[in-house]
C-alpha cells in the first residue's frame, strides 16, 4: 500500500470519532474533559480512554491527545493525573502549548511522543529547531504561512510537520490571541475562547472586520505532500459528525488523485465560502467572511446525505491468511497483519460427498471481511485431498480469527514513567528593593530626555533600533532590541544580520516573545529577556525558559497576581505594568482598504458595536497588533508587585508627552485618570 501523509481528523466526541475512522482518517486528535483547547466539546473520559485508543489501534488509526492549554501551579496536580492517564492509555502522541508542561512530559515520560500545538506559534525554522532541541517529534505550523514558507520549514527540520488543511481560521496568530480573555475573562489559551472576533467590528465601513472565511486546502494535498508535510490536520472538534465525515472524505479523494467534493464541504459548513489566502500569499479582503442564513440552509440540506458515509466499516488493513485442513484434526486459520499473528481452530473437516473444499471455495468465504477493519490480501491453503468444511464453519473460523486479530491490535501499551528527576534549580532570591522600571517604546520618537533619565531599561523594535544605532553610543547596556513577533522564514537571515551588526555596535540584550526569536537571540550571543508572548504562567514554564537560555522573563498578562507571586523561577521575573495590551497578533490587517495599505502610517483602528475604537499598530508592514482601547494602569498599586524584579511600561500609540506623563505617574505612585483597566491581574481567568 502506498504510504502517504496522514489525514488527521478532529474527534470532539464518540460520534465524531466514529465518523473520522469509518471515513478513512489515519489519525484522530481528541481532548479529555479538562486541560484542552476545546473545553466546549463533548471530549473523552480518562477512564474509558484505553478502550477508545484500543478501538482506534485495532483499525490502524493513531490517537493524539490534546493537553494544549496553559496551566497554573495550583492546577498542576490535577493535570499530572490526566497526563498519567494519557500515558497509561498508550496514545500515539500528546499536543502541548505550555513550555512547563512540555518540560514535565519530557522528564516524566521520555518516550511519549511530544507534539507542538499551533498555540506555540511556530512560524519559522528557528522555532522548529528549538522544538527539536526540546525533544518534540511533530509540530503544528502556524496557519498564516504561505506555500513557500511551509516548504522552507519542512526542508529544514527533522520533525514531522503538521498543517491545517480545512476548517475555521482564527483572525489572530494562534497562541497570541488575548481578545476573549481581556474582554470576557475566557482565555483561548485555556480552551475557553468565546469567539468575540465573530462579532461585528467595523473597519472603513466594512463589517465583521475580524471574521475570516474558513480555510480549505483539501484540493492541494498532493502539492503539500510534495513540500514535505507529514500530517493534514482538519480543524473542528466543536463540529458535527457529518462535518468530520465530509472533510475526511474530501481529503481521501484528493490523495487518490480525484477532485474533492468542495461543494458538499461548503454546504456542510462555511462562512461565505472558503479561502486559501495565507497559503497563496494573497492576504487581502477576499479572506473575510461570515456565517450567513444561506450557509445554514445549505448545511441542513446535506446532513442526511452525509450520514450514509458512516454506516458501514470499510476494510483498510490488509491481512494474509493460512487455512490448514487435515484429516481428523480441527481446521485452523492463521491471520497476520504483518505485526500481529493469531491462529484459531474450528471444526474437524468431513470427507467430501460432492465437491471438496478447495482454495477457490475457501477464498470466496474468507474474503468476506465486511464489518471489520480488514481485507484479505493473500490466502494460502494447506487443504487435505477430499476434505470439506461447510461454508458456515469457514465463516465462523474467519470471524473468530479477525476478532482475535482486532483484540491483539487493540492491546494498549502504557508508557513507562521515568524515575523522579533531581530537584529543579533553586528559585531566585526575592528582590530586596522596588522593582526596576523599564520602558518599551514603539518608535524612537518616544525617546524623550525624561524617558532616558527615568527608565532603567529601554527597548525598541529591532528595525527601529537598527535605523538609530547612535542610541547605543551612550548607555548601550540599557538598550534591548525587541525581535519581531512574526518573522517568516525568508526574514530570518535579515534579522540575524541586524542582530549581529547591533551587537558589534554595543547591543547586549534582546526581547523575545516566541521560540524562534529566542533561538535567534541566543545564536547572536545576546542576553535574552522572555516577553509576554511566551505565555509563562507557572513555575515549570519559568524553569524551562531558563533552560532555553532566558536570563529574565516577562510573565503573561493572563497570569493573575497571586499566581504570579507564587511562581518559583530561577531567573528574574517581571510583568507589563502599563500599556494598551496587545489583544491579537495579525498577519492580515483588518484596517486595510480595497486598495491595500494606502497612506496608512502604521496606526489605524477598528470599531466595536458600542462605538469603541480598538487601535491597530503595524510593525514594519510585516504584522499588526490589535490593541486594547483602555490602557492597563498599575501606577497606584505598585507595592502589590514588590515580588517582581522589573516592571515594564509598554508604550504603543502614546505621544512623547504622554510617555513622559505616564512615567512620572509610576515614579510618584499617582492614580490614573480617565478610562483604564487593571487587565487580568486581579481577575480569575476561566
Can you name each region flagged by the protein language model?
Residues 134-135:
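Hydrophobic alpha-helical bundles that form the membrane domains of multi-pass transporters
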Residues 2-122, 140-144, 149-231, 238-544, ...:
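Active-site pocket-lining/capping segments in soluble small-molecule metabolic enzymes
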Amino acid at each position: 500500500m502506498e504510504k502517504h501523509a496522514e489525514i488527521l481528523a478532529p474527534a470532539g466526541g464518540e460520534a465524531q470519532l466514529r465518523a473520522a475512522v469509518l471515513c478513512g482518517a489515519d489519525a484522530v486528535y481528541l481532548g479529555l474533559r479538562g486541560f484542552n483547547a476545546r473545553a466546549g466539546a463533548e471530549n473523552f473520559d480518562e477512564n474509558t480512554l484505553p478502550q477508545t485508543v484500543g478501538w482506534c489501534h485495532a483499525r490502524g488509526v493513531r490517537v493524539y491527545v490534546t493537553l494544549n492549554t496553559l496551566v497554573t501551579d495550583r492546577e498542576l496536580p490535577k493535570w499530572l493525573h490526566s497526563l498519567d492517564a494519557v500515558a497509561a492509555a498508550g496514545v500515539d502522541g500528546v499536543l502541548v502549548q505550555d513550555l512547563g508542561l512540555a518540560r514535565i512530559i519530557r522528564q516524566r515520560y521520555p518516550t511519549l511522543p511530544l507534539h507542538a500545538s499551533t498555540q506555540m506559534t511556530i512560524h519559522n525554522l528557528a522555532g522548529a529547531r528549538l522544538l527539536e532541541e526540546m525533544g518534540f517529534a511533530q509540530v503544528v505550523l502556524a496557519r498564516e504561512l504561505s506555500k513557500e514558507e511551509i516548504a522552507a520549514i519542512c526542508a529544514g527540520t527533522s520533525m514531522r510537520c503538521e498543517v491545517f488543511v480545512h476548517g475555521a481560521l482564527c483572525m489572530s496568530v494562534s497562541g497570541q490571541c488575548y481578545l476573549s480573555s481581556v474582554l470576557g475573562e475566557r482565555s483561548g489559551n485555556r480552551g475557553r475562547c468565546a469567539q468575540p472576533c465573530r462579532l461585528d467590528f467595523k473597519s472603513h465601513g466594512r463589517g465583521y472586520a475580524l471574521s475570516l472565511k474558513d480555510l480549505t486546502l483539501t484540493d492541494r494535498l498532493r502539492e503539500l505532500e510534495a513540500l514535505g508535510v507529514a500530517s493534514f490536520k482538519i480543524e473542528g472538534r466543536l463540529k458535527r459528525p457529518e462535518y468530520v465525515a465530509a472533510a475526511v472524505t474530501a481529503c481521501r479523494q484528493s490523495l487518490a488523485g480525484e477532485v474533492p467534493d468542495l461543494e458538499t464541504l461548503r454546504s456542510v459548513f462555511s462562512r461565505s465560502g472558503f479561502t486559501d489566502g495565507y497559503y497563496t500569499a494573497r492576504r487581502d479582503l477576499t479572506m473575510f467572511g461570515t456565517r450567513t442564513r444561506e450557509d445554514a440552509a445549505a448545511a441542513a440540506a446535506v446532513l442526511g446525505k452525509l450520514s450514509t458515509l458512516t454506516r458501514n466499516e470499510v476494510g483498510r488493513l490488509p491481512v494474509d491468511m493460512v487455512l490448514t485442513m487435515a484429516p481428523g484434526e480441527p481446521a485452523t486459520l492463521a491471520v497476520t497483519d504483518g505485526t500481529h499473528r493469531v491462529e484459531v481452530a474450528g471444526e474437524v473437516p468431513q470427507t467430501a460427498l460432492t465437491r471438496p473444499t478447495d482454495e477457490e471455495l475457501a477464498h470466496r468465504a474468507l474474503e468476506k471481511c465486511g464489518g471489520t477493519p480488514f481485507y484479505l490480501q493473500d490466502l494460502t491453503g494447506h487443504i487435505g485431498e477430499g476434505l470439506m468444511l461447510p461454508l458456515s464453519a469457514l465463516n465462523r473460523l474467519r470471524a473468530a480469527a479477525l476478532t482475535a486479530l482486532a483484540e491483539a491490535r487493540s492491546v494498549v501499551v502504557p508508557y513507562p514513567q521515568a524515575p523522579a528527576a533531581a530537584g529543579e534549580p533553586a528559585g531566585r532570591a526575592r528582590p530586596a528593593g522596588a522593582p526596576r522600571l523599564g520602558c518599551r517604546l514603539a518608535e524612537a520618537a518616544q525617546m524623550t530626555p525624561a524617558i532616558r533619565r527615568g527608565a532603567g531599561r529601554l527597548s525598541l523594535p529591532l528595525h527601529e533600533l537598527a535605523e538609530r544605532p547612535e542610541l547605543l553610543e551612550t548607555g548601550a547596556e540599557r538598550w534591548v532590541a525587541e525581535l519581531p513577533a512574526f518573522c517568516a522564514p525568508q526574514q530570518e537571515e535579515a534579522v540575524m544580520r541586524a542582530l549581529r551588526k547591533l551587537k558589534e555596535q554595543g547591543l547586549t540584550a534582546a526581547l523575545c516573545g516566541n521560540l524562534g526569536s529566542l533561538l535567534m537571540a541566543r545564536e547572536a550571543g545576546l542576553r535574552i529577556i522572555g516577553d509576554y508572548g511566551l505565555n509563562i504562567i507557572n513555575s515549570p514554564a519559568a524553569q524551562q525558559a531558563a533552560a532555553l537560555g532566558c536570563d529574565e522573563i516577562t510573565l503573561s498578562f493572563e497570569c493573575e497576581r497571586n499566581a504570579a507571586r507564587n511562581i518559583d523561577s530561577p531567573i528574574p521575573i517581571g510583568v507589563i505594568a502599563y500599556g494598551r495590551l496587545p489583544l491579537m497578533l495579525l498577519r492580515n490587517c483588518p484596517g486595510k482598504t480595497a486598495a491595500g495599505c494606502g497612506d496608512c502610517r502604521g496606526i489605524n483602528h477598528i470599531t466595536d458595536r458600542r462605538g469603541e475604537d480598538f487601535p491597530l499598530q503595524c510593525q514594519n508592514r510585516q504584522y499588526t497588533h490589535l490593541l486594547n482601547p483602555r490602557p492597563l494602569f498599575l501606577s497606584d498599586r505598585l507595592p502589590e508587585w514588590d515580588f517582581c524584579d522589573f516592571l515594564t511600561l509598554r508604550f504603543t500609540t502614546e505621544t512623547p508627552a504622554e510617555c513622559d506623563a505616564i512615567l512620572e505617574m509610576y515614579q510618584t505612585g499617582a492614580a490614573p485618570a480617565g478610562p483604564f483597566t487593571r487587565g487580568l491581574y486581579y481577575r480569575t481567568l476561566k
